[in-house]
Every structure is written in structure tokens, then in C-alpha cells.
Amino acid sequence: MESLRIYNTLARDKQDFVPRQPGEVRMYVCGITVYDYCHIGHARMVVVFDIVQRWLRARGYRVTYVRNITDIDDKIIRRAVENGETIQSLTRRFTDAMNADFDALGVERPDLEPRATEFIPQMLGMIEKLEANGYAYQAKDGDVNYSVRKFANYGRLSGKSLEDLRAGERVAANDAKEDPLDFVLWKRAKPQEPAGASWESKYGAGRPGWHIECSAMGCTLLGAHFDIHGGGQDLQFPHHENEIAQSEGATGQTFVNYWMHNGFVQVDSEKMSKSLGNFFTIREVLEKFDAEVVRFFIVRTHYRSPLNYSDVHLDDARASLTRLYTALKDATPDAQPLDWSEAHAQRFAAAMNDDFNTAVAVAVLFELATEVNRTREPALARQLRLLAGLLGLLGREPREFLQHAAGAARTGALEPHEIEARIAARVAAKQAKNYAEADRIRAELLEAGIALEDKPGGSTEWRRV
């Protein structure tokens, strides 16, 4: 198989992927802060990196995939206080909700899923190293901060210079930071904070800053220097920039070789956000659309491109996925393994090896579906199912999807028992030679999004359209 090329944010270009250890990939992705239900932007991130790890494994790599959980944070503390519940109760509840949402989307669990609160000693150890190396200082307010001007390569990932970043910054008269760009490593506990919000340390009771959490977990679980670090585009600066400064300042080694960032989800060409009121949780979306349709909607756009969310686009994704399942409905795949020498498989692999270009890979699936429709060839049906499976798609029985998932979540959609009752009435009308009534029922069902197919022998199959 040809070499894999990955767009490396650090290099601002595609590069051949060469893992540090032959045949082995270590990858860290910034996960969720568990204080609320996950939104469609989170869905995109986890589906994107789910596909990355699936493709790496398909290429034969031994992958260690780490995706963390942030279970201590200012937002978590505020929400727990607002709700009158403990931090642990809040984070446990939303971790369970997160897992349910991601499972529904067909996202495979990471190999390791560390919780920030499990790594407090490692975070403090890294902070102490940074202090010893001259990168950290304890301010007069008790916080421990990172001194960005001490790190020569600060801004390399984001392409921002310290001078550009300082432009427009104003330092308050009582600001404890030496530089307005300095960021917190350890936040001193405040008297009004609830139980479970702080830990004892040589710097006094407090909790870790967000950035040090990922540095410590990544270095502890994958080593000081690993292959791939990923996350949403919004994390490039300051989070990932700060991770580099912390990790390399503490260890003296290159932190990560390849940085990957997925693009934003947009609504009406604006970034989705709570402040704009164009915010959709995964649960809200799954009330209207089948989970595999949502996954397909994400997969068919290249991960670095903006993803425009709308019901119209999801309806189109449903119709497109229905086309793929329809191709498999009357062509049973054979039981042979995937044939990588076959032309469609080669084009699919070429797309995926070109920076995980799922948009082109999905186009290959439609080319293959056209051939399956034309030939009903079991070998081609197998290729379609197995290639789609590498994207986490087409894993269900076609008739199950076509009858129960393709459009079933639409408002007013007919239930299966209602459809079967109308088919029975149509059969009775045909037996009574009342063909006008039989045609009326067929047209009525089609208007409701149900297509009928009369089979030899007198049976009738149906599917949603």
C-alpha cells in the first residue's frame, strides 16, 4: 500500500507519515469537558479521529489511542454549584451521557481514556520540572504560571509571534502575571469552592490548569515524544500551543511529530456556538435523524473543511446513505476478505492515504454501489460493505436500515406496523380486483416516504425513501 500523507498543522503542509517506532502509532486526542451534553462539534471531532485510528489499524499499525476526559475545570465547578450536586456526581453523569452519544454514532472506544483527576501527581511533577527549568513561577496570588517569553519557540504551532499576541493586551495594575500571555499551571484554591475542587501541593491547595492536564496525561501514557496529537481547530491556540511549551519545557524533547486539527461545524456559514444560539446537542440531532445518517453526514466531508449543519444537509445524507444500502439489498456479499488489488479498493486506499480524504473515499463507495446495482455481483457487494466498514458505515442489514432508519425519525413518519397494515389492505384490494384502490394505497405510502416493491410470488417489500 502506498505511503500515508498527513496534513501537519506544525508544518502547514502534507507530510509522509513515519512513526517513531516502525509499525507502531501513539496518538492522543483532546477529549470532552464533562459538564454538559455533547454537541455536534464534539460529534465531528470523535468521528474524525475514530476514522483516523481505524485507517491506521487497517494499514497494519499497532495503535495506542488515548482520548482524555477533563473532569475538573472552572465550568464543571460552576455547573455543580448551580445544580447543587457534587463535582463527582456531575462528571459521572455527563461521562455516561457522552459514552452513550458516542456509542450511538459508532465511535469505537479509545484504548485509554484517562480522567484528569487521576493524574494530579503527574501534573504536579511536571509543574515542578518546569519551575526547576526556569519556565514556571508562583505569582503573588498563589497561582503557578508559565512564563511564555522563556520558551523560544512559543507560537510555532499557531504561527503567532509574541509581539502579535501582545498587541492589544492590557495588564491590570494588580495583575499577578509577569506577562499578560503567561498562562496558569496550578490555580490556587478559593475559599468558596466546593469539596473535590482542590488538591494539596507544595504550592498550596489548588487544581491544575487545563493545559497541563493534557501534557501530563499524554507524556505519562505515550511517552515524552509521540506520533500524533489531534483535536478541533479551536484548540490549536492556545491549548495545543501551550501543551507544546509545557511538555518541551519540562522534558527537553520534541513533544509531537504530527498535529492534526478538524474544521469547525458551521450553521448558516457561522461557527456553531452557544452564544449565537445556533447550538445543537448530539441528543437533539438524534431525535430527528438516525445515528448512522449523522455519522455519514460527517464522514462525507473532508475533516479539515468546514462542515455546514442543517436539516436539509442531513436529509440529503439520509437519502445518500439509503442509496448505498439499497445497492446491498438484493446483492448478498460473499464471505471473502477485502481484496485490496481490486480497482475500487485501490482508489479508496489512495483517498484515505491522502490525508484521510473521506470525501473522495465516499465517492468511490457510490461508484462501487453503481456497479453492484448493475451486476448484483457478490464480490463487489462484499467490497462495498467492507470498504464502508472502514468508515464505520453499512454495518446493518440493508432491509433493517431501509425499513427502520432511513427517514424513520422524521416527524409523522409511519411506524412499521402501520405500513404493514396498509400493505395488507392493498393486497386485499388487489385480490378483490379493486386495482384503483390498490394504486391509491401505493401512492399514499409513497407520499409518506414509503416505496413498495412487489416480488415474484406475490410478496411485497417496503423501504423508506
UniProtKB/Swiss-Prot annotation:
SUPFAM superfamilies reported in the protein's UniProt record: Anticodon-binding domain of a subclass of class I aminoacyl-tRNA synthetases, Nucleotidylyl transferase
Binding-site list for ATP? K274
Major location category of this protein: cytoplasm
Q: Which residues bind Zn(2+)?
A: C30, C214, H239, E243
Pfam families assigned: CysS_C, DALR_2, tRNA-synt_1e
User: Which example biological process does GO assign this protein?
Assistant: cysteinyl-tRNA aminoacylation
List locations, semicolon-separated. Answer: Cytoplasm
Cofactor(s) the protein requires to work: Zn(2+)
As one GO molecular function, the record gives: ATP binding
Query: Keywords on this record?
Result: Aminoacyl-tRNA synthetase, ATP-binding, Cytoplasm, Ligase, Metal-binding, Nucleotide-binding, Protein biosynthesis, Zinc
Q: Please tell me which stretches of this chain the record labels as motif 'HIGH' region.
A: 32-42
Give the co-factor note.
Binds 1 zinc ion per subunit.
Q: Which GO terms describe its cellular component?
A: cytosol
Q: Quaternary structure per UniProt?
A: Monomer.
PANTHER family from the UniProt entry: CYSTEINE--TRNA LIGASE, CYTOPLASMIC, CYSTEINYL-TRNA SYNTHETASE
Q: What is this protein called?
A: Cysteine--tRNA ligase
Question: What is the organism field in this record?
Answer: Burkholderia mallei (strain ATCC 23344)
Q: What is the lineage of its organism?
A: Bacteria, Pseudomonadati, Pseudomonadota, Betaproteobacteria, Burkholderiales
